[in-house]
Amino acid sequence: MLAWFLTPVAVLLVVPVAVYAWTRVNPRKVRTEIEIDASPEKVWQVLTDFAAYPQWNPFIVSAQGEPSVGATLTNRLAGNGGEMTFTPTVLAATPGRELRWLGRFVMPGVVDGEHYFLIEDLGGGRSRLIQGETFTGALVPFAGKALDVADGFAAMNAALKARAEQAEKMV
């Protein structure tokens, strides 16, 4: 009788843990990049001017907070047929080089997304922006189109490129 009760309980506990462990080893990754005719400093300035996001950013349509390690941001995304607000924690903020944050859905381990922006100096006042995200968590294998963000990343990259290049010409 006890085995009849414990077997379903064990399955309910083991399956989510196993799926979570699997996604830690096999995360879902999204990566985009674009070359920009602007210095890494100018790209960083545009990327971290959160107050201006509503003017130009088609993906992260608003962002509040400070780009500093440990800070909590409030970001509102547009895409996949709707909007979503989330509050990631900044993991890295190196001016002209890297901005990285960790966002979580509901609680740690359900769906975790580590989002990053890397800025590479190509010389001659040019940069490469790499934007990506690594998704892990128990629901990642079942999230389907909810994690299809590559088009949103690419749209943001193109808009950031246009804004940074325009700002670079004004200097």
What do the PLM-derived regions correspond to, one by one?
Residues 50-92:
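Extracytoplasmic/periplasmic/luminal assembly and interaction segments
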Residues 2-9, 13, 128-171:
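A conserved amphipathic terminal alpha-helix motif
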Residues 33, 63, 80, 109, ...:
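A generic helix-loop boundary/linker signal
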Residues 42-47, 53, 73-75, 90, ...:
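Hydrophobic pocket/interface hotspot
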Residues 2-68, 159:
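Hydrophobic ligand-binding cavity/cleft-lining segments
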Residues 2-11, 16, 20-25, 64, ...:
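Hydrophobic-ligand binding "helix-grip"
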